[in-house]
Design a protein with these regions (language model features):
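Transmembrane alpha-helices of multi-pass inner-membrane enzymes
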Residues: 62, 376-387, 391-433
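A membrane-periplasm/extracellular boundary helix in multi-pass inner-membrane enzymes
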Residues: 142-151, 245-284, 301-305
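N-terminal signal-anchor transmembrane segment
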Residues: 2-70, 86-92, 383-385, 400, ...
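Alpha-helical transmembrane segments of multi-pass inner-membrane proteins
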Residues: 130-155, 174-176, 181-225, 231-244
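Aromatic-anchored transmembrane helix interface
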Residues: 80-86, 96-120, 128-132, 137
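Hydrophobic transmembrane alpha-helices and their immediate junctions
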Residues: 22, 208-209, 242, 250-252, ...
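Helix-loop-helix junctions and helix-breaking kinks within/between transmembrane helices
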Residues: 41-51, 91-106, 185-188, 210-244, ...
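Long extracytoplasmic/lumenal interhelical loops at the membrane interface
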Residues: 37-47, 273-347
Length: 433
């Protein structure tokens, strides 16, 4: 079963449609390039006094989202969440957020909504996107080697935009080992980029040997960044690809992956962990224990204290917007280290339900036997696994691929619904003529 063959729309597309697809894919490529070389570009653009130009791809994402939303065909569930999204923004305003907070949150999530409404164009132009992603993967691997073997000038560099100090590249270490970020801003972002770029390129590879070699190189590079969650997620995703034809096994695993991500932050509230023992032993699980003991319980307690468990803090009160436009008393919502908790802190119970909607999304992609479907399935599973300990909505490229997967499934569902009446043909019986 093929959910949404991208070539179908492209075969009969007009010149205008062709131009729109080209613009969309160029915006996506510009976003991917900026995120891949973010650390280096911020350093050199700041030196040249043109650092604001780095934000143009996300601005273009917002503009294309607004243009495509007018004609985007989606079901009631999508529009219900759009309304909930708007109401959540009003709730955030009641919780002392400013319009700047809402605007910056929309800016941060712009790749997701852009990928969602423009998914058909991105799938149609996937070969052009493939060349860009292939280049960015090679650059990311080269960046790992460069950062590991030399001293790059943008390492630890900070700069100012207006009165706000921003980091071009975060320098830090884990267990006295430098966390390699390459050309990117942060090591964990680099590892996510390598994982997603590799999984995307699998769609175009025919040789299993080449796929195995590429996955081995990618996994080694991710390990060099010392990012544990992306390394484990990528390895598990590769295992899932080997059993993807066992549909019911894949379904069960997907349900487990989603519910573990949803319930993991609550584990520290019901169980006791000895942080001192783990920290003193230098265990690789020390960061996870820190989240279980400090980060996640503190966020949950803050939601309970403020009475925001059901409604959430609101759209504009969670994530990096708290660092740029802080709201007094809400600084704890700057980072969750878990995407399910991120959504819950933002939207309340609705956020939790939104996170569980990954299950039907993954089920639809499991049913899809096309190369596009398999690619989006692997990226979506990897996305969900990394989200256990990462705020994935703060990673632009992760947002782009999440929007692409959601838009792909929504578009396929709408096409299936509109094509059903055409499948019904009534013919008169010969004896009744």
């Amino acid at each position: 079963m093929e959910l949404n063959p991208a070539n179908r729309a492209g075969d009969s597309s007009s010149i205008i449609s062709f131009d729109k697809s080209t613009v969309v894919v160029l915006v996506a490529i510009s976003l991917i390039l900026v995120e891949t070389f973010s650390g280096a570009l911020r350093f050199y653009f700041d030196k040249a006094g043109i650092s604001p130009l780095l934000y143009l791809p996300k601005v273009a994402c917002i503009l294309l989202f607004a243009l495509e939303l007018r004609t985007f065909k989606a079901g009631r569930l999508f529009w219900t969440f759009v309304i909930v999204w708007a109401v959540s923004g009003l709730i955030a305003m009641l919780h002392r957020a400013s319009p700047h907070n809402l605007a910056f949150s929309l800016f941060a999530l712009s790749p997701l909504v852009f990928g969602l409404v423009c998914s058909e164009h991105l799938i149609h132009r996937r070969k052009i996107l493939c060349w860009a992603i292939g280049f960015c993967l090679l650059a990311s691997l080269a960046g790992v080697a460069l950062d590991k073997l030399t001293a790059v000038p943008w390492k630890g560099y900070s700069y100012n935009v207006g009165e706000t100090e921003l980091s071009a590249n975060t320098t830090w270490s884990a267990d006295d080992v430098d966390r390699v970020a390459g050309f990117a801003r942060v090591s964990n972002v680099l590892s996510i980029l390598i994982a997603f770029y590799t999984l995307y390129l699998f769609m175009f590879l025919r040789s299993r040997l080449v796929m195995m070699l590429l996955s081995a190189v990618a996994l080694y590079a991710i390990v060099l960044t010392t990012s544990k969650a992306p390394a484990g997620a990528f390895a598990l995703t590769m295992g899932l690809l080997m059993i993807q034809r066992m549909s019911w096994t894949c379904r069960i695993l997907c349900v487990l992956v989603v519910f573990i991500g949803l319930l993991l932050p609550t584990l520290g509230m019901v169980m006791s962990f000895d942080a001192l023992t783990v920290s003193s032993s230098g265990s690789s699980l020390a960061s996870l224990y820190d989240r279980l003991i400090n980060t996640w319980p503190n966020v949950i307690n803050a939601l309970i204290r403020e009475g925001w468990v059901l409604t959430g803090a609101g759209f504009g009160m969670v994530g990096s917007t708290m660092g740029i436009f802080p709201v007094e008393g809400s600084e704890i919502f700057l980072g969750m280290d878990n995407s399910a908790l991120y959504l819950w802190a933002m939207l309340g119970v609705v956020g939790g339900l939104l996170y569980t909607l990954q299950i039907p999304l993954l089920f639809k992609l499991i049913e899809d036997e096309s190369r596009v479907g398999r690619m989006l399935l692997s990226i979506s599973v990897c996305w969900c696994l990394i989200s256990w300990t990462t705020d994935m909505f703060e990673v632009a490229v992760a947002n782009l691929f999440a929007g692409l997967a959601i838009g792909y499934v929504i578009t396929a569902k709408q096409e299936a619904m509109t094509s059903r009446p055409a499948d019904l043909h009534l013919t008169a019986l010969p004896n009744l003529r």
